């Protein structure tokens, strides 16, 4: 976590012991990439200031005029699915699913005075007892350096491979 006068940045990445997202039968069905090296910046004030969908008042009812795309979580590295159906856990609508890293167990941060750094290495596990997603074998290394009100974010060894369609690209999502 890196704080400034009117904003705060949080960085997250799962390990073999810490999961990144919980997917349940009736909630968070598309929450697969909630912590895949995310770098989220939250600003003071309304949630819209931080990129969340805007809510409008229409005849005393509140409705959202936008939506959240779970494929492009802020700062995350993801495989961009072209179908919402493909993004849901395969053949399973009742079990909980937690997203872990398969073998790497490195994600952490250090702070010194008003400076800080975050680093993570990730390799995706697409199963939990049984295969839940079409394997993408997503891997990446990330680091973020925070100083003087700036965030410097670096990524390397970013790759994905699997038997999914060619229009599904792998990308690190900006804001």
Question: Language-model features: where?
Answer:
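Catalytic and substrate-binding regions of extracellular carbohydrate-active enzymes
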Residues: 1-175
């Amino acid at each position: 976590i890196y704080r400034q006068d009117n904003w705060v940045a949080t960085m997250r990445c799962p390990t073999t012991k810490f999961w990144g997202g919980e997917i349940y039968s009736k909630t968070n069905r598309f929450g697969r990439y909630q912590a895949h090296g995310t770098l989220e910046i939250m600003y003071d004030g309304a949630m819209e200031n931080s990129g969340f969908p805007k809510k409008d008042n229409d005849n005393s009812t509140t409705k959202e005029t936008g939506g959240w795309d779970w494929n492009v979580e802020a700062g995350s590295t993801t495989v961009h699915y072209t179908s919402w159906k493909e993004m849901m856990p395969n053949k399973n609508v009742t079990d909980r699913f937690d997203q872990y890293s398969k073998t790497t167990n490195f994600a952490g941060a250090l702070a010194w005075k008003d400076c800080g750094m975050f680093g993570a290495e990730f390799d995706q596990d697409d199963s939990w007892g049984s295969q839940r997603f079409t394997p993408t074998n997503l891997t990446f290394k990330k680091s973020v350096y925070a100083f003087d009100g700036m965030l410097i974010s670096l990524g390397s060894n970013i790759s994905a491979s699997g038997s999914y369609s060619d229009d599904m690209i792998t990308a690190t999502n900006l804001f």
